[in-house]
């Protein structure tokens, strides 16, 4: 059994967990999430604890048990605290703003780029060069951040582009004569 799967997921007060076969649904103060668990994983709920164990005779069940436990833990954290991802725009004239349910980006193209936000993700721009994405689903928040970053990833010479707030961009030295 994987080390991750051995640790149980504690369910805090105010969080409602429902197990329906292999479907796990978690409701909390910030929202609700539903996820289907791999068939090779056995999920049990005892008091305020979720336990995950691999089923016998299924290949890869050990790894799937650890994955299911990590996903369930992220669901609990998401509905209680939520997830946040910060992006920075580095470059002359690079700006971001919120237009309805979309993020409008001026990234040096001939036209502004508008990225529509999916349901469950909200965005705000504290400054013209910062974007803060928030939501309950860790995977969805990270995917939206990656999609926005992909419009203009940081280039290796000056570091201009869209980057994560904690990202260290490795710059190359310019060509010498």
From Swiss-Prot:
<dbReference type="InterPro" id="IPR000702">
    <property type="entry name" value="Ribosomal_uL6-like"/>
</dbReference>
<keyword id="KW-0699">rRNA-binding</keyword>
<dbReference type="InterPro" id="IPR002358">
    <property type="entry name" value="Ribosomal_uL6_CS"/>
</dbReference>
<dbReference type="InterPro" id="IPR036789">
    <property type="entry name" value="Ribosomal_uL6-like_a/b-dom_sf"/>
</dbReference>
<dbReference type="GO" id="GO:0003735">
    <property type="term" value="F:structural constituent of ribosome"/>
</dbReference>
<dbReference type="GO" id="GO:0002181">
    <property type="term" value="P:cytoplasmic translation"/>
</dbReference>
<dbReference type="InterPro" id="IPR019906">
    <property type="entry name" value="Ribosomal_uL6_bac-type"/>
</dbReference>
<dbReference type="Pfam" id="PF00347">
    <property type="entry name" value="Ribosomal_L6"/>
</dbReference>
<dbReference type="GO" id="GO:0019843">
    <property type="term" value="F:rRNA binding"/>
</dbReference>
<keyword id="KW-0689">Ribosomal protein</keyword>
<protein>
    <recommendedName>
        <fullName>Large ribosomal subunit protein uL6</fullName>
    </recommendedName>
</protein>
<comment type="similarity">
    <text>Belongs to the universal ribosomal protein uL6 family.</text>
</comment>
<dbReference type="InterPro" id="IPR020040">
    <property type="entry name" value="Ribosomal_uL6_a/b-dom"/>
</dbReference>
<keyword id="KW-0687">Ribonucleoprotein</keyword>
<comment type="subunit">
    <text>Part of the 50S ribosomal subunit.</text>
</comment>
<dbReference type="GO" id="GO:0022625">
    <property type="term" value="C:cytosolic large ribosomal subunit"/>
</dbReference>
<keyword id="KW-0694">RNA-binding</keyword>
<comment type="function">
    <text>This protein binds to the 23S rRNA, and is important in its secondary structure. It is located near the subunit interface in the base of the L7/L12 stalk, and near the tRNA binding site of the peptidyltransferase center.</text>
</comment>
């Amino acid at each position: 059994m994987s080390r991750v799967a051995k640790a149980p997921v504690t369910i805090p007060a105010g969080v409602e967990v429902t197990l329906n076969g292999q479907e796990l649904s978690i409701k909390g103060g910030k929202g609700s999430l539903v996820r289907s668990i791999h068939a090779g994983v056995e999920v049990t709920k005892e008091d305020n604890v979720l336990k995950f164990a691999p089923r016998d005779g299924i290949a890869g069940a050990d790894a799937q048990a650890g994955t299911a436990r990590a996903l369930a833990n992220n669901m609990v954290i998401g509905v209680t605290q939520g997830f946040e991802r910060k992006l920075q725009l580095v470059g002359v004239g690079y700006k971001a703003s919120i237009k309805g349910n979309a993020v409008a980006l001026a990234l040096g193209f001939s036209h502004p780029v508008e990225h529509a936000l999916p349901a469950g993700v909200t965005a705000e721009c504290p400054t013209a060069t910062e974007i803060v994405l928030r939501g309950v689903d860790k995977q969805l928040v990270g995917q939206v951040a990656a999609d926005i970053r992909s419009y203009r990833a940081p280039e290796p010479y000056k570091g201009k582009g869209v980057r994560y707030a904690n990202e260290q961009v490795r710059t190359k030295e310019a060509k010498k004569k």
